[in-house]
Amino acid sequence: EEMPFNRAQRAWVYRAAKNLDNTQPFGSTRDLRPPGTLLFANATFPALETATGPTSPLIIGPECAQPYASASFFNISAMSYGAISKPAVLALSNGARLAGCWMNTGEGGLSPYHLAGGADLVFQIGTAKYGVGDGQGGLDEARLREVAAHPQVKLFEVKLSQGAKPGKGGILPAAKVTPEIAAIRGIPVGQDSRSPNRHPDIADTAALLAFIHRVRTLTGKPTGFKLVVGDPGWLDELCREIIRQGLSSAPDFITVDSADGGTGAAPMSLLDYVGLPLTESLPRVVDKLVEYGLRERIRVIASGKLVNPGEVAWALCVGADFVNSARGFLFALGCVQSMQCDRNTCPAGITTHNPRLQRGLDPQDKAERVRHYVENMRHEVAIIAHACGAATPRQLRR
């Protein structure tokens, strides 16, 4: 019951999503003694409330034809329609619009329900290229342009790997491949939807940069990539290749996913043993970008088990520009951590396509909970920032 998220972590999200007071009496229940415990250094003279202000927008891809400016440092991470249900996607897309944050489509393509909410969208290009593929493992430029023509689609994210299963492609079980989902993805109905373990046309760093440049040129929109860091030495190779080719070759952002990410079901051998956790990888990515003079060119997005204000504030301190969460938003929708995500039997109606189980998930009601979760997250991260002497959360430093 206490793993992977303990009762206190879940309770904070539930209360925040319901817009309830999260004030607690009688001291912390968190054990502050273990080495490595996350603690913030409060300022002797903290920032006065009169000196604080709203978070300013950050621009992603300023050199693009259509750069994107976002003021929200907390956003919805990648979860595809198929992995989660129609009412869940509707609730998230509507809630994201209300909260003024973005929503990542996940690798399953662009569905009508992503668009219905009116939120800003990040279109993820997974290894199977669902929705923009040519059927042979390559990119269909015409289909890509069709997706980019939607004004709601603001960014494109090339997925190299994800926290739950670095080195392995995504799997959507046959029970969840409905006719509608099959049509959106361009796959057979009622068969397992399996993505390759990597993009067939991206075999090295130069090819990655070339692919990003191609997508950005075709769409006119900021393009980056998502990965779980394995070998930190590869970061040097990436930075050197960018410098060799010129700054115009650089990705507009890098999404650093933690090895303990987990919206996708995966073999336990990958869940438990492969990839670096965000506590190890995020500082390395930020430091390498600074070392090579690329930090101002490339935005950094952190994801992976960041569901409470302290964890989000930590990521901003370390150097992330934005934080994405997936499971935090599942809790906001009513997830009870029943661990049935891949079985089409989710009792909360979030990861099932069974209409009977979906009846308890009202998209309008849950959209408000998504909104409250984002707003309360931003508010409490700001409280931490002010206690540390920072006027806004993005001024936090390690």
Language model features: what each stretch is:
Residues 106-108, 221-226, 251, 295, ...:
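Flexible, glycine/charged-enriched surface loops at secondary-structure junctions
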Residues 194-358:
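Glycine-rich phosphate/ribose-binding loops and adjacent secondary-structure elements
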Residues 75-85, 127-137, 169-171, 195-204, ...:
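Active-site mouth loops of central-metabolism enzymes
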Residues 1-104, 108-118, 124-164, 173, ...:
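Conserved, well-structured core domains of diverse proteins
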Residues 1-42, 273, 284-297, 307-313, ...:
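Alpha/beta catalytic cores of nucleotide-metabolism and tRNA/nucleoside-modifying enzymes
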Residues 123, 129-131, 174-203, 264-279, ...:
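Glycine-rich tight-turn/loop motif centered on a GG-T
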Residues 148-173, 232-233, 237-252, 256:
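Carboxylate/His-rich catalytic cores and anion/metal-binding grooves
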Residues 90, 99, 150-153, 172, ...:
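Internal alpha/beta core interface subdomains
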